[in-house]
């Protein structure tokens, strides 16, 4: 029975006793009026005597205190003895008072023996009290007995505080000691709920070797220079690396050595048409066997970043023997909801593999989890508390950690915020020391950093963060123009403002090609006498001379191509205008970096067209809040809408963000830019009567000669076959499509068989004789129709690269 129930019972009894008391008093009042009056007088006299005794006792205590002050100081032992004696006296006095009070209450509520008049009716209260059996235990006495200790403690403290300072100090010390003891017990009870495991000494344990390095860098990635890799990481949302010997990032799923059916599954089921920035760098690093710390915002594809390497790691290890429960890989999640979500993703990836997984979370059926663990599982997704519960069952003999060689901590910052650090550390102390640990987090607080330094072996810290890629002293601006004519007018208005300034503030205008540079120079000559232009098509002496004049002339203007942005270092440049908006993050950073050199400040202005979605995406990523606050609200809204449209296209595979590697014209985002350049050429050609040839994508009336059919092989299997005729394509296009590196990359990415067949016929020597060998073509074969079609798309992309190269070659041969 709880204290609340006892209190309720006490109140009910009190109510019944009060009722009986009132009845008994009524009877006594009618029969013994005289006796009551005498008894009342006696009570008044006794009350007065009690008060006098209290006054005498108070005076006596006061005299004792004064005498104590006059006597010499006592020793500590005497003080302690005196305090204990007085404390005992106070306790005994309080007990006597409480006993008297309880007896008085009993007397007040005693039921008369007879309700009718008797010879003993004239009894006094003292006589009645003598007849009461005080040895009988009363329920009310029992209740007071239960709470007596607490009440005595409180009365004791109050009495000591009023009467004796020494007793108060001693009592406070006892109270503080009691509080400390209670806190200690509460802490011990709390720690009791946190189960920790005993560390394992692996020195005397013979462990099976594990395979961790499962990645071979493709030749395509090896061919990149260090500067190109730096630009690539900059394009990929400004990836930052801390650590030594980090593998280079990849740009395609096929470069990871993953089978095509897995690649297609990832693209179709997980909707990752291309790798996200965090995936491009962390997957090669984890597959190389390194401990990795991945820091990226939520929703950036971190789950796939560790699931793919984890599954490959599990497949590379020895299978579980009979009687081994596993697991080989463990994923820790902070919440059961996240653990269930991760398990669903794992189930999708291992559906066709000989791998099993289990989700171990609190609140779920423990018996089912135990039964499944007994059969053996390779992957465990768990919350730390439940996993330790499983490891502690049956004296720690149910689940063994000896086979664990891959550990993942997802959302590590939340894991540690929830207080799971001791549990995870306890588990890791039971796992083999040569394990591979992967840690992913949206933030990287100090407690996560300290944990990583203790349990991870020379980790690579990979941070994806687009913020901060542009110099903080650069004020970034933009203008969205309706068409090319409007953009040129905007350029003129900007230059007009700049020319009116008296301070030497130079301006650089970046354009996308040599042809546009020449056209803009011709049109701007009438507006400024301080205009100089340089590009790679000009003789070296002319470029050097124009650059020197630009440096010496105040308020001068330099017109150049994007390629020249790296080699320019003019401290006086205070403004940069991107007439043709940047195609890549690296290009934007290098172009805007020509201003705000040293400790100076500068401004960058980007001129965009409504169809340049990729440029809007780059600007939206690179600009800071303070930059947006200085731009018109309507312009900012339009820019964000364009950026969101491009981001949606990235997820659906409609668009691809250029990385500046692999040639131009491959990405869908570049088509709009090439179209806008053609529009500019057409307008300027009519206005200035200038004949120019602009780079094009593909001829408008051009069509590829392809045919796809389904055939049945001799063994009964059905295959898809495609003939891609390359005979009639320009020479540079054929070379680009059929060179060994292109063919090997496509075979690795699609899994198709690609062979070159037929013979080459010049355009003037084509025969229709069926007996002759067919025209030169590529034969593409695969059992999967989608793989064949994907291979055809890659061939068309290579053809576009070839057309771009052919056009550029023609321009170089005919311009001068």
Curated annotation (Swiss-Prot):
Biased composition (Low complexity): 29-46
Record-level GO cellular component terms: nucleus
Family: Belongs to the DEAD box helicase family. DDX46/PRP5 subfamily.
Protein name (Swiss-Prot/TrEMBL): Pre-mRNA-processing ATP-dependent RNA helicase PRP5
Entry keyword Methyltransferase: no
Subcellular location: Nucleus
UniProt motif (DEAD box) ranges: 410-413
Alphabetical keyword list: ATP-binding, Helicase, Hydrolase, mRNA processing, mRNA splicing, Nucleotide-binding, Nucleus
SMART domains assigned to the protein according to its UniProt record, in alphabetical order: DEXDc, HELICc
Pfam family, one: DEAD
UniProt note: domains: The Q motif is unique to and characteristic of the DEAD box family of RNA helicases and controls ATP binding and hydrolysis.
GO biological process, one term: mRNA branch site recognition
Keyword Membrane: no
E.C. designation(s): 3.6.4.13
UniProt region (Disordered), positions on chain: 1-48
Positions annotated to bind ATP: 296-303
């Amino acid at each position: 029975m709880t204290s609340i129930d006892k209190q309720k019972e006490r109140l009910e009894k009190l109510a019944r006793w009060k009722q009986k008391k009132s009845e008994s008093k009524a009877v006594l009042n009618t029969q013994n009026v005289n006796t009551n009056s005498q008894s009342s007088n006696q009570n008044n006299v006794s009350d007065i005597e009690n008060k006098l005794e209290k006054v005498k006792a108070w005076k006596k205590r006061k005299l004792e205190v004064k005498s104590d002050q006059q006597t010499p100081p006592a020793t500590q032992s005497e003080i302690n003895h005196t305090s204990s004696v007085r404390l005992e006296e106070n306790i005994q006095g309080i007990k006597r008072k409480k006993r008297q009070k309880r007896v008085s209450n009993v007397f007040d509520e005693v039921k008369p023996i007879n309700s009718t008049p008797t010879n003993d009716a004239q009894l006094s209260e003292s006589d009645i009290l003598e007849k009461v059996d005080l040895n009988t235990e009363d329920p009310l006495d029992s209740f007071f007995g239960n709470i007596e200790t607490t009440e005595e403690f409180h009365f004791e403290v109050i009495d000591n505080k009023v009467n004796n300072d020494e007793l108060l100090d001693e009592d406070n010390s006892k109270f503080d000691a009691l509080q400390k003891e209670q806190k200690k017990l509460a802490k011990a009870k709390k720690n009791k709920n946190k189960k920790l495991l005993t560390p394992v000494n692996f020195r005397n344990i013979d462990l099976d070797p594990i395979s961790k390095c499962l990645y071979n860098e493709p030749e395509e990635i090896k061919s990149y220079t260090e500067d190109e890799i730096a630009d690539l990481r900059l394009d990929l949302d400004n990836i930052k690396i801390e650590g030594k010997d980090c593998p280079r990032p990849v740009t395609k799923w096929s470069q990871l050595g993953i089978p095509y059916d897995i690649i297609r599954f990832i693209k179709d089921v997980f909707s990752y048409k291309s790798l996200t920035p965090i995936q491009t760098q962390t997957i090669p690093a984890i597959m190389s066997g390194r401990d990795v710390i991945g820091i990226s915002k939520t929703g950036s594809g971190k789950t796939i970043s560790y699931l793919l390497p984890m599954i490959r790691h599990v497949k590379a290890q020895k299978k579980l023997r009979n009687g081994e429960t596993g697991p080989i890989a463990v994923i820790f999640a902070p919440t059961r909801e996240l653990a269930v979500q991760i398990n669903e993703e794992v189930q999708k990836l291992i559906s066709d593999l000989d791998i099993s997984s289990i989700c171990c979370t609190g609140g779920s059926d423990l018996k089912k989890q135990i039964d499944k663990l007994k059969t053996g599982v390779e992957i465990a997704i768990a919350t730390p508390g439940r996993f330790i519960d499983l490891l502690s069952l049956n004296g720690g003999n149910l689940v063994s950690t000896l086979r664990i060689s891959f550990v993942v901590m997802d959302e590590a910052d939340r894991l540690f915020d929830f207080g799971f650090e001791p549990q995870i550390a306890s588990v890791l102390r039971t796992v083999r020391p040569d394990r591979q640990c992967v840690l992913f987090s949206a933030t990287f607080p100090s407690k996560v950093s300290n944990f990583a330094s203790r349990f991870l072996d020379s980790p690579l810290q990979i941070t994806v963060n687009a913020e901060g890629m542009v110099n903080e002293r650069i004020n970034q601006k933009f203008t969205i123009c309706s068409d090319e004519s409007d953009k040129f007018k905007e350029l003129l208005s900007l230059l007009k403002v700049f020319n009116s300034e008296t301070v030497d503030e130079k301006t650089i205008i970046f354009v996308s090609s040599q042809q546009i540079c020449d056209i803009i120079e011709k049109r701007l000559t009438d507006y400024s006498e301080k205009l100089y232009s340089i590009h790679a098509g000009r003789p070296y002496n002319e470029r050097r001379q124009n650059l020197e004049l630009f440096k010496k002339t105040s308020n001068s203007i330099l017109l150049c191509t994007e390629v020249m942005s790296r080699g320019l270092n003019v401290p006086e440049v205070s403004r940069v205008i991107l007439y043709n908006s940047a195609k890549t993050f690296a290009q934007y950073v290098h172009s805007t970096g020509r201003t705000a050199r040293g400790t100076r400040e500068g401004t960058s202005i980007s001129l965009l067209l409504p169809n340049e979605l990729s440029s809007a995406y780059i600007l939206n990523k690179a600009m800071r809040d303070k930059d947006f606050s200085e731009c018109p609200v309507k312009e900012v809204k339009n820019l964000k809408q364009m950026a969101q449209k491009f981001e949606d296209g990235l997820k659906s595979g409609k668009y691809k963000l250029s990385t500046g590697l692999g040639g131009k014209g491959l990405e869908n985002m570049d088509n709009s830019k090439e179209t806008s350049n053609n529009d500019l050429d057409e307008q300027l050609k009519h206005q200035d009567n200038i004949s120019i040839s602009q780079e094009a994508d593909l001829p408008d009336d051009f069509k590829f000669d392809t045919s796809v059919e389904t055939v049945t092989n001799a063994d009964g299997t059905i295959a898809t076959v495609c003939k891609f005729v390359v005979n009639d394509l320009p020479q540079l296009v054929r070379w680009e499509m059929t060179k060994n590196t292109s063919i090997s990359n496509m075979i690795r990415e699609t899994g198709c068989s690609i062979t070159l067949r037929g013979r080459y016929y010049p355009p003037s020597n084509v025969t229709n004789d069926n007996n002759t060998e067919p025209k030169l073509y590529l034969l593409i074969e695969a059992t999967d129709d989608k793989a064949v079609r994907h291979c055809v798309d890659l061939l068309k992309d290579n053809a576009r690269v070839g057309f771009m190269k052919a056009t550029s070659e023609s321009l170089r041969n005919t311009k001068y």
